[in-house]
Amino acid sequence: MADPDVLTEVPAALKRLAKYVIRGFYGIEHVLALDILIRNPCVKEEDMLELLKFDRKQLRSVLNNLKGDKFIKCRMRVETAADGKTTRHNYYFINYRTLVNVVKYKLDHMRRRIETDERNSTNRASFKCPVCCSTFTDLEANQLFDPMTGTFRCTFCHTEVEEDESAMPKKDARTLLARFNEQIEPIYALLRETEDVNLAYEILEPEPTEIPALKQSKDRAATAAGAAGLAGGHHREAWTNKGPSYEDLYTQNVVINMDDQDDVHRPSLEGKAAKERPIWLRESTVQGAYSSEEMKEGGIDVDTFQEREEARAGPDDNEEVMRALLIHEKKTSSVTAGSVGAAAPVTAANGSDSESETSESDDDSPPRPAAAAPPHHHRDEDEEDEEFEEVADDPIVMVAGCPFSYSEVSQRPELVAQMTPEEKEAYIAMGQRMFEDLFE
């Protein structure tokens, strides 16, 4: 049986008390947030965001401030959506018993501070020197008093001191407590009215409830969305039927023909007009650099060069630059062959000339393969053949008087069973010897 003194509904006095306190000591954001919690017992954070239209960071700052002052409490609940996903939500509510205790504590703390300030601000005389700005209290009056003149003079500059008006207490300092009690009297009256109120646990720790205004707006939005879906369903179905097919979206057909590449590119090249060659390719930029005598001394095969140039497309018959490069190449090759074949001593001057010519030819001519490369290639092939022959040697093992290769016997265990004891010992000894040779 429920206690008749326990209230199952929040009294109006408690709601007015919360409104008075929040409007007297907090800003407008805190007032709006607490008004929602006064009208609704327990509100989710997302619902408060939708009602107040605050930024999430701003709303959390306001709620954390109220929660730090013990005006509201927070409860976290884990909810499971229709798709099975769990989410955490914060629910805020007002614990009115804690609210009353916090208001009493803060008001008492303010009253005690005012009394302390009033007690400390007694009317004690204070003196100040107008020249050196030294200050003195009433306890130092015996040091300041001059019996000859009957005035108070500074102990440093002997100037007559004046009473410090800035150190005087405020005119309303003694009436501050009376003004405080007068202004806070409505809150005191509400506290006396709610002194013996006993609230039920369902009021102190309420369960989450749905806000009617938000529920109606959600229902209207769902109804409008359903009506729009029914009205536009036919059009969407027709649009989807007319849409393209994406079955072959990732299907690509690529044909690679390596034999007929020239035939494929020839029509495109034939359709384009041949570009005119620049003058520095048609005519030599070096006039008279090399004469016919130098070409003869260099041993250049002019006929071979001309045949090669005629085979190429375009007017490259009289390219002096290519001839100069060939002259350098032939000169370098002839000097190298003559020095190696004749083994004749060469002076330092000739050596310097040949080095300069070689450096110039290396800069201008393309690299040439070495003459000793083919013998080296044959030697590598001979070494590979010898290694192959060494690896190919397979020892012979006797099985019942018949010769078999060692690898064949290793792959066929039934041959081992046909061996005589002497043949088996020879087979085992050969395997051990091959194993030792392998790791030496």
Swiss-Prot record:
Q: Which SMART domains match?
A: TFIIE
Please give a single GO biological process term from the UniProt record. transcription initiation at RNA polymerase II promoter
Please give the residue positions where the record annotates the modification N6-acetyllysine. 67
- Compositionally biased region (Low complexity): 333-353
Where are residues bearing Phosphoserine located in the sequence? 268
SUPFAM superfamilies (alphabetical)? Zinc beta-ribbon
Instruction: Check the record and name the InterPro entries matching this protein.
Output: TFE (IPR039997), TFIIE/TFIIEa_HTH (IPR017919), TFIIE_asu (IPR002853), TFIIE_asu_C (IPR021600), TFIIEa/SarR/Rpc3_HTH_dom (IPR024550), Znf_RING/FYVE/PHD (IPR013083), Znf_TFIIB (IPR013137)
Q: Which residues bind Zn(2+)?
A: 129, 132, 154, 157
The HTH TFE/IIEalpha-type domain covers which part of the protein?
A: 14-104
Could you list this entry's UniProt keywords, alphabetically sorted: Acetylation, Metal-binding, Nucleus, Phosphoprotein, Transcription, Transcription regulation, Zinc, Zinc-finger
What terms describe the molecular function in GO for this protein?
A: RNA polymerase II general transcription initiation factor activity; zinc ion binding
Q: Which family does it belong to?
A: Belongs to the TFIIE alpha subunit family.
According to UniProt, the name of this protein is General transcription factor IIE subunit 1
Organism of origin: Mus musculus
